[in-house]
Amino acid sequence: MNKSIALQNYVIHQLDTFFPTVEGKTKLNVKSFNIGLHAVSNSISKVLAYRGTEFDYLNSGQYATFLYYLSHYVWMNDSDKVTATRIFLLNKALHGIDLFYEVKMPKYFLVGHSSGIVFTKARYGEYCVFHQGCTVGRNFEDRPIIGNFTIMYPNSSVIGKCKIGDNTIITPGVQIINRNIPGNCIVFPGSDGDLKLKKIEKIMAKKYFDI
C-alpha cells in the first residue's frame, strides 16, 4: 500500500476512534493531506537530529507537527472547520500541545518535547525551537512577535506585547511579559526579579538546524 494512503487510514482511524462524528467515517481531502505531509517533511529536513530520515509518525514531535500542518491546510484549503477542529483536538489529546489550526507557523520550526506547549496567534520567525511547557500567549489583544532562531527552553513564557529579536535564547522558567528583547542574547532570570541579558554572537539554533 502507498505510504501516504496508509498514513491517511491511520489518521482517519484515530479520528474516528477518539473524536467520531454523527456523519460517519472521516474523509480527508487527499490534496490537503499531501500538502500537510510535504510541509512536515520539508520542516524536518532541516533538523540535524532527523537528517537523512523520512517522516516518522511514531516520533511524537514529528507527528505533532504533522497534525498541526494537516489541520491548518484542511481549514485553509477545504474550509472544513469541523475536521480541522477534530485534528487539533487529536493533537492536543495525543501530545498535550495546544496549536490551533488558525495559528500561522513558519516553514521551519522544531517541537522538542510537545507536552504542555501553548501557541497563540503570534508572529513566528523561522528556525525556532520550542521545548516542553513553554507558552507563547496573548494579553487581551496584544500578541508577541517571535524573531528568527528563537529558542524557548522548558517552562519559559512570552506573553503579550513583546518583540523578541532574532537569536534570542530564553532559559528555563523565564517569563517575558509585555517587554521587548533586542536579540542576539541569552535571557536569564535575575535575582532582583528583573531579567538578565547576556550578549551572544553565534546563532545557537545551528545546534538544532542545518542552516
Question: Where in the sequence are the language-model features?
Answer:
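Residues in well-ordered beta-strands of folded domains
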Residues: S71, T120, F188
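Left-handed beta-helix
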Residues: M76-Y127, H131-I145, N155-S157
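Short, charged low-complexity intrinsically disordered segments located at boundaries
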Residues: N42-V47, A64, I97-V103, I117-K121, ...
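N-terminal alpha-helical segment
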Residues: F66, L110-V111, I151
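Terminal amphipathic alpha-helical/low-complexity segments used for targeting or macromolecular assembly
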Residues: M1-A93, E201-I211
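Glycine-rich hexapeptide-repeat left-handed beta-helix
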Residues: N139, I146-I211
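Amphipathic repeat-derived elements
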Residues: S32-L37, R138-N139, T150
